[in-house]
């Protein structure tokens, strides 16, 4: 019997825990069951109390104190410890039925999704046939305010694509906190970010305004040392790097974003629908036969 899950990922501040809370609330309102797992060993406050919390196994504070690691190293240590104690996950999940949506709230340290093989190993363990057999979807959140800074947006998008390639499971990319960009970005302009391409850099109004203000030509003076420029991150080399990153993302043609506003119930419902489609949740549910109360009453009479 298959189980179903969504692993919620993204950089720090993307609104992962807030989205998990909104999703659980929506599921409860629609009489669907959720099993909430917190895998962030540094998280302390939750709107919905986790059904399973990694801090019951190991906390980031304990890892840092006992092993003498920093925050990022401590986080990696916590996940390595988790991978050595996977029975802790199995015992909690193996009794769940296919009616549950397992929601896994992940930490925001990006190296987990890009640099180390721990998460791919964890996803493989959860999804392999056997006692768990979880049909997993990866849900990657990127804060919508990133669209204001296009270099930052493409950097975040590159991380999302890296996670897609690493995990090799159905993947949904989300622009979260849409309520924060209302009035800042026109709907027509925002639509272009849903399928990123190099053209976004060509039409960057911030870069265009800067060039007019500084009276620059198409390229900066590369003879200047980086420390002689007002800002190192706005030179010709930086622009070429951004263009290379954007070109790489466009060449893969893998990234499409969906919009999320957790304050809007319809928006949360739409994201849940995408998740259900990815993991084929409804196809696995037993068909429910209609109950004809009148016929039942006649039969009983």
UniProtKB/Swiss-Prot annotation:
Binding site for GTP: 13-18, 176-179
InterPro entries reported for this sequence: Gpn, Gpn3, P-loop_NTPase
Short motif Gly-Pro-Asn (GPN)-loop, span: 70-72
Organism: Gibberella zeae (strain ATCC MYA-4620 / CBS 123657 / FGSC 9075 / NRRL 31084 / PH-1) (Wheat head blight fungus)
Pfam families: ATP_bind_1
Function: Small GTPase required for proper nuclear import of RNA polymerase II and III (RNAPII and RNAPIII). May act at an RNAP assembly step prior to nuclear import.
Classification lineage: Eukaryota, Fungi, Dikarya, Ascomycota, Pezizomycotina
Protein name in UniProt: GPN-loop GTPase 3
Signal peptide interval: none
A GO MF term: GTP binding
Gene3D superfamilies: P-loop containing nucleotide triphosphate hydrolases
Site feature location: Stabilizes the phosphate intermediate: 72
Description of how the protein assembles with itself and partners: Heterodimers with GPN1 or GPN2. Binds to RNA polymerase II (RNAPII).
Cross-referenced PANTHER family: GPN-LOOP GTPASE 3, XPA-BINDING PROTEIN 1-RELATED
Family, per entry: Belongs to the GPN-loop GTPase family.
